[in-house]
UniProtKB/Swiss-Prot annotation:
Residues 5-63 form the TRAM domain. Keywords: 4Fe-4S, Iron, Iron-sulfur, Metal-binding, Methyltransferase, S-adenosyl-L-methionine, Transferase. Belongs to the class I-like SAM-binding methyltransferase superfamily. RNA M5U methyltransferase family. The lineage of its organism: Bacteria, Bacillati, Bacillota, Bacilli, Bacillales. This is Uncharacterized RNA methyltransferase lin1863. One of its GO terms (molecular function) is 4 iron, 4 sulfur cluster binding.
Length: 453
């Protein structure tokens, strides 16, 4: 059907055939696809068209005539408004199957790869998994509140709890909000640039139980700062209270200055027996239980004997590097963020791992230089951002020819693209293992190992 034969605000009946990568249902009217949030495959629904483009349109679900067996009642009271989760209406088994199918379909469509995609490694309990809460502060109905933004807006939802946040961190956000309100702290107003408090962040260390509270403010002076700190320490079991100062009129959460107001500068957590010092701004995986699962896949794929030189591109604070260093001859890590490299060096020292070298820079610039200087990896690990590996880095890998490339990915599309380049260059992959790091969302992590033929 031509889009011109359909009209905005028209109600249509259709059957949902599939889910898109962002979890929307897909149904067709005479071959013309409509994307409908919250609809599930197999459901017959009535939907109202909200937008029409030449080749596809969008609609809002009005009624479900035939309900999917995978549909569940979302337990979160603000799920329909909040932008934090997108799959609470799909059973957890259904979410795991959706993520596996996304990886398999992407491998075939983008990578032209016929690889095994086993079942997604999920969680026994897919709730309360996040060790970091980061919420904006604002006025809602004249009172100070802290919560996530409403979908596609910067309106804050007044929420009493978040079911994917660790309970200790969740309680800390609510207590902090109450204490700030008690002292009349003025929330930051994006439109005027006025106000004192921008965000509340909490970090919780799963293995030690340590808690950090971060107050992101517009200036160093915070009215009733001493009283706020006193109340926080009286009411919460807290290890560290930190202030970050961000005076800029921007959507970026953190400013350049961070100072410890009370307690320790860091909290400490462990992954696979490796200790990590985590500061307010450290990059650290947000799901500690699944991080162990993800890293175990990487460790198993590397098959280290103690004789190997390992290069870890995009190494962050050294979390994978240090787990591998226990079993490698030497590990070299590179990361563009200098603070992360400083953290990686400190974490290596904390664990008495002397067989590590960390350097600040772009992986695609530093690794070719290492290669020129005679550093050749037996195993090369990549854990790139969503955009995948830089082309120059892939060219260096193909020139260096490490026996194995262990690829940890947060984007199946760029993983498939990069795997295609590496397989055309002489590597072979047999399987891609999806890991569910972010239940109730559409985000997918996956691990594969490419072996030189």
């Amino acid at each position: 059907m031509e889009a011109s034969l359909l009209k905005k605000n028209q109600s249509v009946e259709l059957t949902i055939e599939d889910l898109t990568h962002d979890g929307s249902g897909v149904g067709k009217i005479d071959g013309y696809p409509l994307f409908i949030p919250n609809a599930l495959p197999g459901e017959k629904i009535t939907a109202k068209i909200t937008k029409l483009n030449k080749n596809y349109g969008f609609a809002r679900m009005e009624n479900i005539e035939v309900v999917s067996a995978e549909r569940v009642e979302p337990p979160c009271a603000v799920y329909s408004k909040c932008g934090g989760c997108s799959l609470q209406h799909l059973s957890y088994d259904g979410q795991l199957a959706f993520k596996r199918n996304q990886v398999e379909e992407t491998m075939k469509r983008i990578g032209k790869l016929n690889v095994e995609v086993p079942d997604t490694l999920g969680m026994e309990n897919p709730w309360r998994y996040r060790n970091k809460s980061q919420v904006p502060v604002g006025f809602v109905n004249g009172k100070l509140t802290a919560g996530f933004y409403q979908k596609r807006s910067h309106d804050i939802i007044d929420m009493s709890t978040c079911l994917i946040h660790n309970e200790k961190g969740d309680v800390a956000v609510q207590k902090t909000r109450e204490i700030l309100a008690k002292y009349g702290t003025e929330p930051y107003d994006e439109k005027t640039g006025k106000g004192d408090i921008r965000h509340i962040m909490t970090r919780f260390a799963h293995t030690t139980g340590q808690l950090m509270i971060v107050l992101v403010t517009t200036k160093e002076r915070l009215p009733f700062k001493a009283e706020i700190i006193q109340d926080l320490t009286n009411q919460l079991e807290v290890t560290s209270i930190v202030q970050n100062i961000n005076p800029q009129k921007t959507n970026v959460i953190f400013g350049d200055r961070t100072k410890t107001l009370w307690g320790s500068d860091i909290i400490e957590d462990t992954i696979h027996g490796i200790r990590f010092a985590i500061s307010a701004r450290s990059f650290y995986q947000v799901n500690p239980l699944q991080t162990e699962v993800l890293y175990q896949q990487a460790i198993d794929s590397a098959e280290l004997t103690g004789e190997e030189t390992v290069i870890d591109a995009y190494c962050g604070i050294g979390s994978i590097s240090l787990c591998l260093a226990k079993k490698a001859k030497h590990v070299y890590g590179v990361e563009i963020v200098d603070q992360a490299i400083q953290d990686a060096r400190a974490n290596a020292e904390l664990n008495n791992l002397t067989n590590t070298t960390f350097e600040t820079g772009k992986a695609e610039e530093v690794i070719p230089q290492w290669y020129k200087n005679g550093i050749v990896a037996d195993v090369l690990v990549v854990d790139p951002p969503r955009k995948g590996c830089d082309e120059t880095l892939l060219e260096t890998i193909l020139a260096m020819k490490p026996k194995k490339v262990v690829y940890v990915s947060c984007n199946p599309g760029t993983l498939a693209r990069d795997m295609k380049i590496l397989t055309e260059g002489g590597y072979e992959a047999k399987k891609v293992q999806p890991v569910d790091m972010f239940p109730m969302t559409t985000h997918i992590e996956a691990v594969t190992v490419l072996t030189l033929k």
